[in-house]
Amino acid sequence: MNGSGSGIRTRRTAVTGIGVVAPNGLHADTYWKSVKEGASVLDRITREGCEHLPLRVAGEVRGFDPSALIEETFLVQTDLFTHFALAAADAALQDAGLTKAAAVADSPYSVGVVTAAGSGGGEFGQRELQKLWGQGSRFVGPYQSIAWFYAASTGQISIRSGFKGPCGVVASDEAGGLDAVAHAARVVERGTDVVVVGAAEAPLAPYSMVCQLGYPELSTDEDPAIAYRPFTSAARGFVPAEGGAVLIVEEADRAHRRGAVVRATVAGHAATFTGASHWDQSREGLAHAIHGALDEAGCAPEEIDVVFADAMGVPEADRAEALALVDALGRHAPRVPVTAPKTGIGRSYCGAALLDIAAGAGMEHGQIPPTPNVFDICHQIDLVTATARPASSAPLVLSRGLMGSNAALVLRPGPGSTA
């Protein structure tokens, strides 16, 4: 997998486990039920210290108790975004039918870890900065040096589970989620048995929110029902969210041999870069990424049965995405269903695309989830709204970052799909 896509792949990778921590569910099954029903959980922000900020609406992960899931040793040295990732990784391994001991039975070097993150540990960092300026440097805890770092989740999953295979972190803005999955597939193709891959974000600490206020794409509307409505004439930006998802990616033949349920296969990926907030240029860049992903997957445009849209919620960006689909899919574009479940939970930056993959893999249940809160579509796309539709089999997942990264990823259904 390279930046532009480079022909049909000779080995396929399988997604055998999915772990989710999201505003609408702390488990993959509850997440899927919510997105299938088109539920919106966007709400007024309740975090202490955020009362006077202009950002009013977000997707908060509520009811998450990290102390019930993660050992104290790891809790004290990690931020909330890593707590999400650790919990999702545990759930993904369980979903894949892999205990940590079984995963490393052959060798601890047979399992790798790849994550993506956009900002790192804002909540932990804010607390320690307050100590620095309020009490003095000797009161700053030693774990500040690692907890804020965007690579922390990769390191802590690896250390906690004893996974010593290839590990890494992808930093390509919001598109990093798809790029991380592609990198994980590449690692498996090169000989690693299993890769734990994902992205989870926690951008709702006051410090983190202040850092986001410089984004002109951010919605500051106070009404959760209209704050995030991409592809409409009322589009006014996006709302942020916490959470994300972790996948277990392994070599497909190995998965079949151990009797694993294959949720999907990673068929193709490509990425481009078109510059920060240059939404007019993102049309060409996104179309090129789609072409590359289709080429690598050996997939004709008419084989794509649903598009999980990036859905920025900015008029210029939405228009560029709609036109990119026409450029890449040609005559098939008006007929392919497009969906954006994230309008019901918010954009969890790098985690958003992983949640879309989780929803795409969830189409084994036979339905395309709808796009909450969106009805008056002003672009020539077949957006799935209000209720779910019967599912087909080849999702195309799109993601763009505020700094100009574009990515596209093609999934193929697992053998047990009902699509």
Swiss-Prot record:
Pathway: Antibiotic biosynthesis; curamycin biosynthesis. It comes from Streptomyces cyaneus. Disulfide bonds: none annotated. InterPro entries: Beta-ketoacyl_synthase, Ketoacyl_synth_C, Ketoacyl_synth_N, PKS_Beta-ketoAc_synthase_dom, Thiolase-like. The keyword Acyltransferase applies. The keyword Secreted does not apply. This is Putative polyketide beta-ketoacyl synthase 2. This putative ketoacyl synthase lacks the active site cysteine. Belongs to the thiolase-like superfamily. Beta-ketoacyl-ACP synthases family. Keywords: Acyltransferase, Antibiotic biosynthesis, Transferase. GO terms for molecular function: 3-oxoacyl-[acyl-carrier-protein] synthase activity. Residues 10-413 form the Ketosynthase family 3 (KS3) domain. Its EC number is 2.3.1.-. The gene is curB. One of its GO terms (biological process) is antibiotic biosynthetic process.
